[in-house]
Amino acid sequence: MVLAAQAHNNRKKRQEKKASKPNVLEAKTENQKNYIRSIIENDVVFCTGPSGSGKSFIAAGIAAQKLLKDEIDTIIVTRPLVCTGRDLGSLPGELNEKIKPYLQPMEENLRYFLGRDRFGMYFNQRRIRFEPLETMRGSTFHESYMILDEAQNCTLEQIKMFVTRMGKHSK
């Protein structure tokens, strides 16, 4: 009984630590170091690579660092809503509920780098926003870090539209 209570307390302490502790981005390969350098030095960066090479993870890590340091006001995350089954309109729920499954991987990356509590705070303050690419036309995002995930599924017109949404002091 004592061991079970102690194990429960230890698990609770680990969860509390995870909730508030941001993680630091570390490049594991030379290509990742080059990608990070490119993001820091340029306003617009396109990255290609095989699945699991860290493209989205690194973009989220740098965005989180910039938000934590107050170097940006907002992180904007989008991706094309490519369906393999029913189209988006036929899915149940409000727009946010419909796009959530598509943006879940990036949400998990940002939670990892910010910690659960900070992620929740920034999300509630709308400093982290998940926007459908299809509804961005006409918007301008100033002082923002913009991530277009899974861009290989975009048309050239969608990529051009996304890049032209960048306002002052955005990357």
Where are these regions (language model features)?
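Conserved P-loop
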Residues: 48-50, 57-125
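Pre-Walker A adenine-sensing motif
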Residues: 24-42
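Conserved P-loop NTPase nucleotide-binding/switch module
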Residues: 81, 85-92, 158-171
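Pre-Walker A (Motif I) flank of P-loop NTPase domains
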Residues: 41-47, 143
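Conserved nucleotide-binding/hydrolysis micro-motifs of P-loop NTPases
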Residues: 53, 80-85, 135-137, 152-153, ...
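Short glycine-/polar-rich loops that comprise or flank the Walker A/P-loop
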Residues: 71-73, 143, 167-171
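Conserved RecA-like ASCE ATPase "motif II neighborhood" in helicase/translocase motors
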Residues: 126-161
